[in-house]
């Protein structure tokens, strides 16, 4: 599928307003907020309808002018721009980021990496625009989470894409695979935060207390939507070895 057709698919997808913030964003918030500083500049890649960006501005965690985001869907971008007119929201190509080098203190790549045809060059682009000691937060559907792996396989075998809303590109990844991929781009893995532990039908029953307890047991790598935190090495650190 061409990029134009992908964008058209997402334009149609975002015609409907998504009212609820994803569980991965809720899991991200405490750690992200603890890292924000008055001078922080934040970039979200694949922002969708901007749930986390709108939350951060509403709760006065960051200045609206310090927020930047791209998405390939013009429908999604226009939706967010109308709500955050002072932010730098634009349609864009993650393979050709048009920002200064080392500009952002924090980058977000939430539920996006699995939809990239070629994640390696995209991650290199993100690395280039991240400041030394800057952070990358990333989440994705983790197929070490066995209940969802079964649903995914059955949805394809039985030709039932609506079971999981299969998107134009929808790859299967696991935690070790993603960590290795991101570290090849030059980032260093720091921590994981678990999110969504049970099978999909039981998600409404997963309380914050239960999630916290499972994270305390360091089981985050088995959750369905883990949030991974990476850091770009500071000045003077060695560059990533070419693969």
What residue spans do the PLM features occupy?
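A short SAM/SAH-binding and catalytic strip from SAM-dependent methyltransferases
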Residues: 106-117
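Active-site acidic short loop of glycosyltransferases
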Residues: 38, 101-102, 118, 132
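Conserved N-terminal segment of class I S-adenosyl-L-methionine
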Residues: 1-100, 106, 123, 194-197, ...
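A short, highly charged, low-complexity intrinsically disordered segment
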Residues: 235-243
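N-terminal non-cleavable signal-anchor helices
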Residues: 78, 130, 183, 242-243
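S-adenosyl-L-methionine-dependent methyltransferase catalytic module, highlighting the catalytic core
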Residues: 3-24, 51, 72, 117-125, ...
